[in-house]
Amino acid sequence: MSDSVGGCIRPRTAVSEAEVEALVHGICFKTGPPRLLGVEVEWLVHELRAPRLPVSPDRLQAVYTALRAVPLRSALTVEPGGQLELSSLPAASLMECVRTVSADLDAVRAVLREDGLALVGLGHDPWHEPRRFLRQPRYDAMETCLDRTGPAGRFMMCTSASVQVCVDAGQEEPGPLGYVRRWWLAHQLGAVLVAAFANSPLAGDRPTGWRSTRQLRWAQIGAERAGGPRLDSDPRGAWTRHVLDAPVMCVRNDGGPWDVPEGMTFREWTRNLAPRPPTREDLDYHLTTLFPPVRPRGH
């Protein structure tokens, strides 16, 4: 089995459980003086003058094609339900980050406005039911996996949006700038940030009983996919165990569906080697399918 990268064929090499432990332990908490920060902002896209009307997939496709020609400093991507996301470059200060993303948002809004569309900064769509815009194997597999716990996964994929803050892990040494302290502090701030950004009390045009219906959806998805490891004095070890013991969402297959045995963890995959042996690329992909409140990304 091989990967085709830039026209070159690269053999896939299986990874063992011990190799996975070493890789996750070594790459997910890169330490050093905390200097840079970034932000990822997701937006719902609605009709400018009639936001209760759904935007057709053809219109979304046309406006996203137009946006590809707009020079932006942030990376522009599209979420499964057609939500728009801007991911900033690493910035040396908060003001630099805000200025850059604000300028990009102005440019994006101008293009959308020409087509009668607008960005809406809500955590959950108050009117529309989930509807997939992107038809890709990754999202087919994600939908199948999340459907096992109920409808919340489809709402999360297609009708939710968020603000995600990216910061350096911190120094190896203990103290207020150490990564252990910053990891703990990020988790403590989670509830505060959820409350501060809570602006989505409706779904289907009815109150859900939550100020943040987006947070409700994550709670309904469950801790295996949307939870994090237990906080202790060894974040690297705790995160490594969490990654290995989390269910695999999908096994990529160039010639067919990405289905996976229900409940199979990555640890079990490294031991059973079925439906095929896992590779480093599979590990990297598995890391992108875990959605804890705080995720170490190797920054």
Predicted regions and their residues:
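Terminal catalytic/cofactor-binding subdomain
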Residues: 1-153, 159, 184, 198
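Short aromatic/hydrophobic contact patches that present stacked aromatics
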Residues: 85, 164-166
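Loop-rich catalytic cores of soluble enzymes, especially ATP-dependent carboxylate-amine ligases
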Residues: 123-149, 156-157, 166-295
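Substrate-recognition/cap regions that form aromatic- and gly/pro-loop-enriched pockets
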Residues: 299
